[in-house]
A protein has these predicted regions:
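Non-catalytic, alpha-helical, charged scaffold/linker segments
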Residues: 233, 243-267
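Short coil/turn segments at secondary-structure boundaries
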Residues: 249-253, 299, 498-503
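A Trp-anchored, charged/polar loop motif used as the substrate-binding/catalytic surface
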Residues: 318-334, 349-354
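PLD/PLD-like phosphodiesterase catalytic module centered on the HKD motif
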Residues: 2-92, 110-203, 207, 211-216, ...
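Active-site cores of enzymes that catalyze phosphoryl transfer or operate on phosphate-rich substrates
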Residues: 46-75, 80, 257-328
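Short acidic, glycine-rich surface-loop motifs adjacent to enzyme active sites
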Residues: 95, 100-102
Length: 527
């Protein structure tokens, strides 16, 4: 009897297990089918994104050199303080080379200079080169200036280990240079590239090297951990140095330095023979602005980086790559295939060129956002003279763009935001200096394309200044996510603007501002 019961229970147990297994198999099959379907959809989406990105890269490959790297080789920094600490740490640990290209180094940046000094003392094999703009770097001379501060490093370590160069635009010479005030003469062209190379890494940014950029002036900062990219920009840097004046310390000069044109430089010098200088500069720079004749690809990588330069004052014919790349991207976004894309465009100074403005309005995006500094976050806020009128001038240009958005019937798709964090020159007040573009493809959640660098996308950037940028094109989900996060956090202090906001009394622009804009354009400069 007991045996029968046991056998009955065993049979029942087997039947239950069999039924459960059948049930589980059914669920597994459903899950497997669902997973396969999801994977297939993901694959189709991935293939679609890849083919769309190929439209961009196919054109970019005709324009610029390309470097295929791992997405992990790109680090995105968030704050001025993080940028400063990262830069100092990398300089302290430098073994072979440090090259720093910037508009200027603050004349009181003794802590930063001490960081370079300690690195030179710690490593006798280290060589340091610094490139700034002549006009900005010597503005305060014979009082303490950027140039005199850097000359102290040469005095201490010698010209074999420390080099300081000052680029002078060929557009400002003779009588014009003699009569224009120092604060205004920078409108005729500057060395504006921000290249911070340390050994085999480079930080690309729009930030200069002074206290506000280290504390309360918001910008963007990407670290590229790539020897080929760092070497490329090193070659560009070296070439511009050979087109620039060399600083030497001097006890005889009240300024503490002299700027001379070495015989080893590209000849002639810009202040003596501007046209001859441009001709010689074009010869040495054109190869750097051209794509290689033979393309090498690395199929295993998912991220490409295109170095883009704008060297218009030095190139005849002008073979600069930044403006053609940017306008090419915007034209592509305006085609039916890319309807429904999303983009964010930002610049500290709201003064994009008419061509860029028109192309943005032709993109028909699912959403487009322009972010610019509010007048109270503009570095010129409170300045004296014409420069003090610039925040109001940029405000006027922002209003005109928003009017154009409305006229194009895109008010529901394109937004203009102004960034403000307190008021500049008051406790807790920040300025906004970030620039770039992020492009998110249709049906995607995060950007696949991003442009970062020194350019402000203005008439000045494309006709008078030297600019250097990198364009990132990626299929890597993690890098896309990080670019998306950067795009969002830069808008933490940004507020959407309306036409009514610009009509408020405090935002109205007087005749004197319009007159100042006209004068600056008339005499040959650019905002």
């Amino acid at each position: 009897m007991l045996t029968r019961r046991v056998l009955h229970c065993v049979r029942a147990s087997r039947q239950v297990r069999s039924l459960k297994q059948i049930s589980r198999n059914g669920i597994l099959q459903q899950r497997s089918a669902s997973t396969a379907s999801g994977q297939a959809a993901s694959t189709v989406s991935s293939q679609s994104s890849a083919s769309q990105l190929a439209v961009f890269t196919g054109e970019l490959d005709k324009l610029s050199p390309r470097f295929d790297i791992s997405a992990d080789s790109i680090q995105i920094l968030k704050s001025p303080a993080e940028f400063y600490e990262t830069l100092k740490t990398k300089i302290r640990n430098a073994k072979r080379r440090v090259y720093l290209s910037t508009l200027y180094i603050g004349k009181s940046e003794h802590e930063f200079i001490d960081t370079i000094r300690q690195a030179l003392k710690s490593n006798p094999d280290l060589q340091v080169s610094l490139l700034t703009d002549y006009l900005r770097g010597t503005r305060e001379a014979p009082n303490p200036s950027c140039a005199s501060l850097l000359a102290s490093l040469i005095q201490e370590f010698g010209p074999d280990r420390v080099e300081v160069r000052l680029y002078h635009t060929p557009n400002l010479t003779g009588a014009r240079k003699a009569i224009l005030p120092k604060r205004i003469n920078e409108g005729w062209g500057l060395q504006h590239m921000k290249l911070y190379g340390i050994d085999d890494e480079i930080i690309m940014s729009g930030a200069n090297l002074s206290d506000d950029y280290f504390t309360n002036r918001q910008d963007r900062y990407h670290v590229f951990k790539s020897k080929p990219i760092t070497d490329y920009f090193s070659e560009l840097y070296r070439t511009i140095c050979d087109l620039s004046y060399r600083v030497s310390p001097s006890d005889k000069e009240a300024s503490g330095f002299i700027a001379e044109w070495p015989l080893q430089n590209v000849q002639p010098e810009p202040l003596k023979d501007p046209s001859g200088y441009i001709k010689a500069a074009s010869k040495v720079l054109l190869p750097l602005a051209s794509p290689p004749s033979v393309k090498t690809t690395q199929p295993e990588t998912d991220t490409s980086v295109y170095p883009l330069v704008q060297l218009t004052p030095l190139l005849k014919p002008d073979k600069s790559t930044e403006l053609p790349a940017l306008t090419g991207i915007l034209r592509t976004l305006g085609t039916p295939e890319f309807a429904g894309s999303k983009w964010t465009f930002t610049a500290g100074y709201f003064n994009m060129t008419p061509e860029v403005r028109k192309l943005l309005l032709k993109t028909k995006p699912a959403s487009g956002t322009v972010v610019a500094a509010s007048p109270w976050a503009n570095g010129f806020y409170g300045s004296k003279g014409v420069s003090g009128m610039l925040p109001a001038a940029y405000s006027l240009l922002g209003r005109r763009f928003l009017d154009a958005v409305s006229k194009a019937g895109l008010s529901n798709q394109i937004a203009v935001k102004e960034w403000r964090r307190g008021t500049v020159n008051t406790p807790g007040g920040w300025t906004y200096h970030a620039k770039g573009i992020w492009v998110t493809l249709p049906q995607e959640q995060n950007p696949s394309i991003s442009l970062i660098g020194s350019s402000n996308y203005t008439k000045r950037s494309y006709s008078l200044d030297l600019e250097a940028n990198t364009l990132i094109v990626t299929r890597n989900a993690d890098l896309q996510r990080r670019l998306g996060a950067e795009q969002k956090w830069l808008q933490d202090y940004a507020t959407p603007m309306t036409q009514d906001d610009y009509a408020k009394t405090e935002r109205r622009v007087g005749l004197h501002v319009r007159l100042a804009m006209w004068i600056v354009t008339l005499v040959g400069g650019a905002l």
